[in-house]
Amino acid sequence: MAQVSGMSDVPDMGRRQFMNLLTFGTITGTALGALYPVVKYFIPPASGGTGGGAVAKDALGNDIKVSEYLAKHLPGDRSLAQGIKGDPTYVIVTEDHQIANYGLNAVCTHLGCVVPWNVSENKFICPCHGSQYDSTGKVVRGPAPLSLALVKATVTEDDKLVFTPWTEIDFRTGKEPWWT
């Protein structure tokens, strides 16, 4: 091929090569875009921060204000609130009319039914298969294999109830928590 003076020796990109690069770039971009959420799913979130805490909410979705809650509930009362991950969680009023430092996840450890508090028998009784738990959520009759999960209940400075994951030893069994 003859060279014209003043022209550099840079080869032209042919039409076919350009279309191949364009197609490859489009397919690669689409594949990476589709794989991003899959990869993100398998990478655990960074630890630290609030530890997955949630402000307790009442049946209407309003934040629970402890002073208002205690005005409406008697000592020994156990009532449901929305807790961590939206799970139904029992708020417990102690005998000295304070919020207990723990709450109970109301999901039965047998098949996942919500376990109601039975005031007359002073225990939780699962309506699905009859599992029973004492007032602290410890299993006393199966078929449930484990006690109800605990959450830490804390009252904030602005009078709200916050649930955070329970990471200490389970005071009912003296063992590491099974739910962590």
From Swiss-Prot:
Residue ranges constituting the Rieske domain according to the UniProt record: 66-162
Catalytic activity: 2 oxidized [plastocyanin] + a plastoquinol + 2 H(+)(in) = 2 reduced [plastocyanin] + a plastoquinone + 4 H(+)(out)
Molecular function via GO: 2 iron, 2 sulfur cluster binding; electron transporter, transferring electrons within cytochrome b6/f complex of photosystem II activity; metal ion binding; monooxygenase activity; oxidoreductase activity, acting on paired donors, with incorporation or reduction of molecular oxygen; plastoquinol--plastocyanin reductase activity
GO cellular component, one term: plasma membrane-derived thylakoid membrane
Subcellular location(s) per record: Cellular thylakoid membrane
GO aspect biological process, one term: photosynthesis
Principal location listed in the UniProt entry: membrane
Transmembrane spans: 21-43
Cofactor: [2Fe-2S] cluster
SUPFAM superfamilies, sorted: ISP domain (SSF50022)
Signal sequence, start to end: none
Sequence positions that bind [2Fe-2S] cluster: C108, H110, C126, H129
Quaternary assembly: The 4 large subunits of the cytochrome b6-f complex are cytochrome b6, subunit IV (17 kDa polypeptide, PetD), cytochrome f and the Rieske protein, while the 4 small subunits are PetG, PetL, PetM and PetN. The complex functions as a dimer.
Function description: Component of the cytochrome b6-f complex, which mediates electron transfer between photosystem II (PSII) and photosystem I (PSI), cyclic electron flow around PSI, and state transitions.
HAMAP family the record matches: Cytb6_f_Rieske
Similarity comment: Belongs to the Rieske iron-sulfur protein family.
Annotated protein name in UniProt: Cytochrome b6-f complex iron-sulfur subunit
Source species: Thermosynechococcus vestitus (strain NIES-2133 / IAM M-273 / BP-1)
